[in-house]
Amino acid sequence: MQGPPLLTAAHLLCVCTAALAVAPGPRFLVTAPGIIRPGGNVTIGVELLEHCPSQVTVKAELLKTASNLTVSVLEAEGVFEKGSFKTLTLPSLPLNSADEIYELRVTGRTQDEILFSNSTRLSFETKRISVFIQTDKALYKPKQEVKFRIVTLFSDFKPYKTSLNILIKDPKSNLIQQWLSQQSDLGVISKTFQLSSHPILGDWSIQVQVNDQTYYQSFQVSEYVLPKFEVTLQTPLYCSMNSKHLNGTITAKYTYGKPVKGDVTLTFLPLSFWGKKKNITKTFKINGSANFSFNDEEMKNVMDSSNGLSEYLDLSSPGPVEILTTVTESVTGISRNVSTNVFFKQHDYIIEFFDYTTVLKPSLNFTATVKVTRADGNQLTLEERRNNVVITVTQRNYTEYWSGSNSGNQKMEAVQKINYTVPQSGTFKIEFPILEDSSELQLKAYFLGSKSSMAVHSLFKSPSKTYIQLKTRDENIKVGSPFELVVSGNKRLKELSYMVVSRGQLVAVGKQNSTMFSLTPENSWTPKACVIVYYIEDDGEIISDVLKIPVQLVFKNKIKLYWSKVKAEPSEKVSLRISVTQPDSIVGIVAVDKSVNLMNASNDITMENVVHELELYNTGYYLGMFMNSFAVFQECGLWVLTDANLTKDYIDGVYDNAEYAERFMEENEGHIVDIHDFSLGSSPHVRKHFPETWIWLDTNMGYRIYQEFEVTVPDSITSWVATGFVISEDLGLGLTTTPVELQAFQPFFIFLNLPYSVIRGEEFALEITIFNYLKDATEVKVIIEKSDKFDILMTSNEINATGHQQTLLVPSEDGATVLFPIRPTHLGEIPITVTALSPTASDAVTQMILVKAEGIEKSYSQSILLDLTDNRLQSTLKTLSFSFPPNTVTGSERVQITAIGDVLGPSINGLASLIRMPYGCGEQNMINFAPNIYILDYLTKKKQLTDNLKEKALSFMRQGYQRELLYQREDGSFSAFGNYDPSGSTWLSAFVLRCFLEADPYIDIDQNVLHRTYTWLKGHQKSNGEFWDPGRVIHSELQGGNKSPVTLTAYIVTSLLGYRKYQPNIDVQESIHFLESEFSRGISDNYTLALITYALSSVGSPKAKEALNMLTWRAEQEGGMQFWVSSESKLSDSWQPRSLDIEVAAYALLSHFLQFQTSEGIPIMRWLSRQRNSLGGFASTQDTTVALKALSEFAALMNTERTNIQVTVTGPSSPSPVKFLIDTHNRLLLQTAELAVVQPTAVNISANGFGFAICQLNVVYNVKASGSSRRRRSIQNQEAFDLDVAVKENKDDLNHVDLNVCTSFSGPGRSGMALMEVNLLSGFMVPSEAISLSETVKKVEYDHGKLNLYLDSVNETQFCVNIPAVRNFKVSNTQDASVSIVDYYEPRRQAVRSYNSEVKLSSCDLCSDVQGCRPCEDGASGSHHHSSVIFIFCFKLLYFMELWL
């Protein structure tokens, strides 16, 4: 943006020569702002002086020059009377006006003459409206929803109703989502945006495009743990080097306001840039708050010569120190940190000057404000205030010296000392006259050994040495409240004229006959008003002064919020009451935890935001050096046209004089050397609790000005604050003046601490903490509700305990803990309900724990197709069966039968989770993305897409898109782990490009992302059309072998074809010729042949039909189904075919679709439909994606709309028949029934009617860990991996176990990407960052007692990883856990091992030493399980030896 041009003499004065010749005195003074902005008026001030004709017609024109053509775009005209001072306002410039050359021409005419005429170029200001972007929070976790509002306003804060675009961008500036051409309601638009489970962490932005301008709001996405309490640290910002102590206070409170008990570790650390640092560390107890102190000897010891460079440093003025505080809560052991900086000063007191002018006006008074404070931040004592502040005032005249005279003589110097008493506040005013000959002023202040100084070296220039001074005695000037101005001068004052400028506009003008008068600010004056007062002397000189005053904004529109009560208990219903000034207002409310804004800066719309926004409209010069009357007007950004004498004088290079600069430094040494006076310091970095948003409300008040909403207080024990804004057509914006707070708290409550899951047969300690904030200690009975789903292992005969209850005394303002040893007896999620009863209060909490079956989970699915599609009534009978293996874990079996009336039905219902494997890399993430595209395509073609299903699919796609951008590299390519990989992957880049292109019709895809990926792919194509991969291909079937370049090229070609939408002239002919040539030479493996067939079919190659015929010739036929079987030997027992075989069938089906061979493809579709798992997917991600694409394309051709089938399920597993009715209305509904577990499981399925349906038998069960599962490799099962799990333990340490897992690939070459899943022993966790990433370990995921390690690949060389596990819950009788490794893209290649630790907790160990929990006899407590076993073994051995002897 170009700033306003400096106002030259030609701008300031242009009058008719004839008029000047006869004018007896000045006749006019015209002022106008130097800027123009769209949507804003240009107001011109016109004052006709006493020598002016009685009436003057003033015309103002706004001229625009574009393409060398100047036209008038706005004009206004008015008649002004002699002696008047009024304004002439041009209409506002249209909001869509472009940045052109604009000039303002002002002409004054009488009947006889042109009194004045001149023009000036105006600076075009692009800022025309205000846009506020509000989010409910400023910091989000993955998977959270971002709520935001856009508020668009004119500069007067009236609603600006317009169309705008909204863009969400991630930290890499990728476009994630957009809303285009959005219309607002009274300038307000409210939206939500869902973050994915793995978004790019960092600073995201909401960008709003309106009127060719973009407005931004950032929010941060980060992973963090919610703390239960907050810690604050209070210290002085400054500390005197003479102080004997540095004191401070630490406060630790729960978010609901109660004190924290625990331990404090405090560290005093000098922030030195040199050498080795020393520090002081102290530890002590805290109960809500604690005071601390460092004495001068301690501080000197660490600050003196700790850096080893003391001889080069001025230790009398050391650098700052950092004070670090860690508070550890005694109940849970959780720690929180906070720190602050303290700056050391040479003196005990700080003396500051402010509120003084930077220009001297001789013979008028100089005023300033002086503030005296203690360096340590404490208030001045009465004894200290008995001492005066002594101010030495030195006035000099160096006019000749500084005007360039060679004499350099000092003409005058006057010094006086003034004593001032110090009030309790430490702040006082000083005032004294400036001598008539003064041109310089220096002040030095002294107080109890401390000193400060300031100087003014500028002199206001007036030819007649006539001055006025403008002041106000009022503070906190606000809109609507009058304030007083006082004008003083060194000569008799005439009638005064004034004008007020704010935000680049002339907002008020007038005349006053008194030297003391009042003005009443309006909203247009905010946030800062530039007030000019002047009069004209008899000789025509303009005598002026300027005063800039901050004006507090006061909204005409009011909004008030009230809670129906200020305190409430969690889950209690309360009312939020809203009152506004006008009906038909839009109201936006947000209520969040009180600490949310302390953790990160708020993104709320606050008064501070509004004032800052108003400041952006202020575009004057604001030099602060108004040394003459010309500069006074310039200071307010005004253009002036006058025939009066407007003094203008330049600063004559005073500061270029080296001798002057040297003397200035010497005289002000005390003020300049002490650089710490200017140090901003560092605000304490406080870690705060970041809660969920409670209320996000948008409402139109309609005809009401009062509304009430009933809401339920969340279960959190914390404080909630609500803020709001209101907008109406007439009154514009209004804000709540202060947040309204609701304290959600109960003085007596339970906190449960238990593991996320355990395995059946294990026992765990249920930790129950009772918090008592009543005024008295209370006896509490803690009761666990009895259940047949778990046993309570309490055997004590103590009076205060029974099997399911304990009694304890809980002190006031404190907490106490009891432990109950629990043994779950049922599988699944079981509820545990705890009640605490006392004579004065009670609480009850229910929490779930997941109980898993022992052993290793297995699954089996078998499907049948019920094809009754001949448009006539039919019937059919099918049988499904399954036999559980002998080592099945009793009680783990689950049998389910499902039915649905659509080929894609199982997958549509399983969109949220199609496969059983984790998916944490760049390709696997697409399982959240690609299937949704094919489902949407399919349902759209079938005209069965519902709004709910569409929104669900789009949400998955948007989140998948967010996650996938994590894996895009700087060069535009994609790889399995993004920038962590050494290079991009052509295979994965092609896959992502294809999916993004297919998704583009449904969600917002950044076109730059597509272009960069396409360009990178084309850069990896050889001249013969072949593509190559610079890295390693993670898909095992695309790596190695003679035909891998052929397979890769066929794969990439099918992706590039979709880019023709953006680049129609894409040429893939060389690649097609390459594939045709390779096909003619012969393709031996089915996978490569299937991909080539699909690629050739996609472009209509003459070879496509021949390729498909060859592929069909190699197929297997069975029971009306067609499929392909690879030649590789069986790898493991699995009901599912190889992922490779599924992909081959899918590509074959797609080729049939492209070649319009519908009937020939039906047998393939039948086979693919039967291979799905119970979730609706297949074995892995790539086979699931390709198979669903093929099924969706093919099934869309089938006529299955008319459906009415009665399905009946009978057999031993179903004692009473299960019936499913499938018709046209519910054909997409997945109907489910649980069946009884019998051995073997067999069901008969009969179907009658017409249409199409799929029935699926799903079986889930666990198998016991066999002996072979503990060995390195099972030869019998021909496992693809060697796998060994070694447990490192210490019998004296029950809380740490190290796992050493080693694996290698037993097949030829290397595996594809491998996934190692490590299930931890119950009660253990692995610390974050405990496992380092490497060339092999690309990613580690922590997931509720399980680790997922993504391995780049595994070869014949053994790879080992050490996993340190730490106990975080007490669990005894620990069951075996398992470790597995699997080739991700060929899951049949796998190995599984189980493990356990010999060092276990016993039931006696669960309770430790907590009073009231004694499941074992005294003396047995704490014994180790293995020690007990050894003791029994030894005892029996001795017994038998005795018999033998």
Curated annotation (Swiss-Prot):
Against Gene3D superfamilies, the record matches this protein to: 1.50.10.20, 2.20.130.20, 2.60.120.1540, 2.60.40.1930, 2.60.40.1940, 2.60.40.2950, 6.20.50.160, Alpha-macroglobulin, receptor-binding domain (2.60.40.690)
This protein's source sits in the domain of life called Eukaryota
Q: Where is the lipid attached (GPI-anchor amidated alanine)?
A: 1420
* InterPro entries tied to this protein: A-macroglobulin_rcpt-bd, A-macroglobulin_rcpt-bd_sf, A2M/Complement_sys, A2M_N_BRD, A2M_TED, Alpha-macroglob_thiol-ester_cl, Alpha-macroglobulin_TED, Ig-like_fold
Which residues bear sugar attachments? Answer: 68, 118, 247, 279, 365, 419, 513, 645, 1086, 1355
What Gene Ontology cellular component terms go with this record?
cell surface; cytosol; extracellular region; extracellular space; plasma membrane; platelet alpha granule membrane; side of membrane
Q: Which GO biological process entries does UniProt record here? A: hair follicle development; keratinocyte proliferation; negative regulation of keratinocyte proliferation; negative regulation of stem cell proliferation; negative regulation of transforming growth factor beta receptor signaling pathway; negative regulation of wound healing; osteoclast fusion; regulation of keratinocyte differentiation
Where is the protein situated, by its record's location annotation?
Cell membrane
Gene Ontology molecular functions: serine-type endopeptidase inhibitor activity
- Record flagged with keyword Membrane: yes
- Modified after translation how? N-glycosylated. 2 forms of 150 (p150) and 120 kDa (p120) exist due to proteolytic degradation from a 180 kDa form.
SMART domains named in the record:
A2M (SM01360), A2M_N_2 (SM01359), A2M_recep (SM01361), Thiol-ester_cl (SM01419)
Q: Where is this cross-link: Isoglutamyl cysteine thioester (Cys-Gln)?
A: 921-924
Q: Keywords on this record? A: Bait region, Cell membrane, Disulfide bond, Glycoprotein, GPI-anchor, Lipoprotein, Membrane, Protease inhibitor, Serine protease inhibitor, Signal, Thioester bond
Propeptide positions in the record are: 1421-1445
- Which region ranges are annotated with the description Bait region (approximate)? 593-702
Q: What does this protein do?
A: Modulates negatively TGFB1 signaling in keratinocytes.
The UniProt similarity line reads:
Belongs to the protease inhibitor I39 (alpha-2-macroglobulin) family.
Quote the subunit structure annotation: Heterodimer; disulfide-linked. Interacts with TGFB1 and TGFBR1. Forms a heteromeric complex with TGFBR1, TGFBR2 and TGFBR3 in a ligand-independent manner.
Query: What is this protein's name?
Result: CD109 antigen
